[in-house]
Amino acid sequence: MAQHTVYFPDAFLTQMREAMPSTLSFDDFLAACQRPLRRSIRVNTLKISVADFLQLTAPYGWTLTPIPWCEEGFWIERDDEDALPLGSTAEHLSGLFYIQEASSMLPVAALFADGNAPQRVMDVAAAPGSKTTQIAARMNNEGAILANEFSASRVKVLHANISRCGISNVALTHFDGRVFGAAVPEMFDAILLDAPCSGEGVVRKDPDALKNWSPESNQEIAATQRELIDSAFHALRPGGTLVYSTCTLNREENEAVCLWLKETYPDAVEFLPLGDLFPGANKALTEEGFLHVFPQIYDCEGFFVARLRKTQAIPVLPAPKYKVGNFPFSPVKDREAGQIRQAAAGVGLNWDGNLRLWQRDKELWLFPVGIEALIGKVRFSRLGIKLAETHNKGYRWQHEAVIALASPDNVNAFELTPQEAEEWYRGRDVYPQAAPVADDVLVTFQHQPIGLAKRIGSRLKNSYPRELVRDGKLFTGNA
């Protein structure tokens, strides 16, 4: 791989020399930072098994190298990246994989280590969604996830990725993460705080990442991180697991934040060592049991991960002063819910007891049961999945429900050719050589649901959402 020139402030280099263990070479650190980052992907096991994904992509000539800490993660090398971006492949468009940096798969691996099986999880700083979607896959779409994002512009991206990956057990919120300790005390079995940070570990992806770096800004960021971890710790139930992570390398934003929490609540914080998380984890292990990943250790981004347990309750915070407002949804009565479920099954949409039907005017929604305890405590940006809109002739089923709930083996499923699937993703109607019999058609490609269509004569009317329509070269190579 070609070198690229990274900007390093002198004070940063001094700080890294002091922070780096004697077992590591500073020259190796500098050399690793100058190398471009290896691409990596994570197979979305909600949609496809790793074995089936490897079989499906075998003809493409991709070189996939397993990532030690994530069974479904792979470093990827491919010859046609310039000709066809990874995000324009059919497998990405249908949610079979997520483009995710290898080291950012570590926090979720830590969250579920040692057989941990939380039922209600919070991702405090969730956008663009790599870790939320990874958590959902580990939970197999069961239980409930509260995915929060402070940046309003990033909430939309977060929802798009959750929808593409077929996730149904997520509620989205848009808050400063510092509110949750007071708003939802002791409500979560597990919390991931991938904290905003100075980004010192991302120079391989962004050579100018340190242009605005200063020791003073590190201290300001660390102060915010302490407030965030304190809030998250209050929201965690006794016995629950908190994973704290950053993509930065200084101790101030990493070890010091976790040690501050332990000093603040000495009887309630237990550090859970990560030395056995995966073979070779001990190479990045700190004396506290955290993973401090310098980029040369595993040839990835710089990263930090700590795992801790809340061993006992701590004093609650004063209740927040903001008003949540009225919740505009009401549960659907059992008899009507049965009729809706039957109609949905007719087009291949099915769900289990983890989801419950709610209604707002003519809209039908499915909410994860595990999130209901939070209703009235926080205001949701989006909750669960929109199933349908009712109208005089029945139901207008929604695209995100199809992606999350449809079975490709449904009697109304119709498999497209590669050329037809590409037309579908471009938002165009499809004219198959042999038209399906049913009027409501579950459109599939590679045996994956990609939408619903109305058959009008020999034409399949496209219902792919306008905001998802793709231009440019797609997977058949045609522009």
Swiss-Prot record:
Keywords: Cytoplasm, Methyltransferase, RNA-binding, rRNA processing, S-adenosyl-L-methionine, Transferase. It comes from the Bacteria. One of its GO terms (cellular component) is cytoplasm. One of its GO terms (molecular function) is RNA binding. It is an enzyme of class 2 (transferase). It catalyses: cytidine(1407) in 16S rRNA + S-adenosyl-L-methionine = 5-methylcytidine(1407) in 16S rRNA + S-adenosyl-L-homocysteine + H(+). The active site is at C247 (nucleophile). Its EC number is 2.1.1.178. GO terms for biological process: rRNA base methylation. InterPro entries: Methyltr_RsmF_N, MeTrfase_RsmB-F_NOP2_cat, MeTrfase_RsmB-F_NOP2_dom, Nol1_Nop2_Fmu_2, Nop2p, RCMT, rRNA_ssu_MeTfrase_F, RsmB/NOL1/NOP2-like_CS. The keyword Glycosyltransferase does not apply. It is found in: Cytoplasm. S-adenosyl-L-methionine binds at A125, A126, A127, P128, G129, S130, K131, E149, D176, D194. Belongs to the class I-like SAM-binding methyltransferase superfamily. RsmB/NOP family. PANTHER family: 28S RRNA (CYTOSINE(4447)-C(5))-METHYLTRANSFERASE-RELATED, NOP2 YEAST -RELATED NOL1/NOP2/FMU SUN DOMAIN-CONTAINING. Specifically methylates the cytosine at position 1407 (m5C1407) of 16S rRNA. This is Ribosomal RNA small subunit methyltransferase F.
